[in-house]
Amino acid sequence: MTDKYENPTSDDYMGVVMGIIMSGGNAKGLAFQAIQQAKAGEFAEAESSLNEASEQLREAHDVQTDLLTRLAQGEKIGWNLYMVHAQDHLMNAITFKDLAVEVVGQEQRLQALENK
């Protein structure tokens, strides 16, 4: 059992929380950037931004999965409002990225129709 997950006030635990928040924020920013790029007709760049967003989300999701696995195995995992906030950031970023994929696709379709 590791202390970094048991004590929700430890620096290690808060580092994990901040990592999830930062990855979620980065992913959401990249997804928004992808939408802006698509609106400008920069579809390769938009795809690249979406791929980077996916990587940020994967990193945060890996930490989340590790925490859930440890909890399922009976380890004591401390929780506080910061962790709840981190999970909220992550889920919002995942949803925003999923919607950004749809918006980029619609923008491609719209621009293709306009260019006919």
From Swiss-Prot:
The keyword Aminoacyl-tRNA synthetase does not apply. Induction: Induced by growth on cellobiose. Negativelly controlled by the CcpA regulator. Also induced in response to galactose. Its cofactor is Mg(2+). Disruption phenotype: Disruption of the gene abolishes growth on cellobiose and lactose. GO terms for biological process: phosphoenolpyruvate-dependent sugar phosphotransferase system. InterPro entries: PTS_IIA_lac/cel, PTS_IIA_lac/cel_sf. The modification Phosphohistidine is found at residue 85. PANTHER family: PTS SYSTEM N,N'-DIACETYLCHITOBIOSE-SPECIFIC EIIA COMPONENT. This is PTS system cellobiose-specific EIIA component. It comes from Lactococcus lactis subsp. lactis (strain IL1403) (Streptococcus lactis).
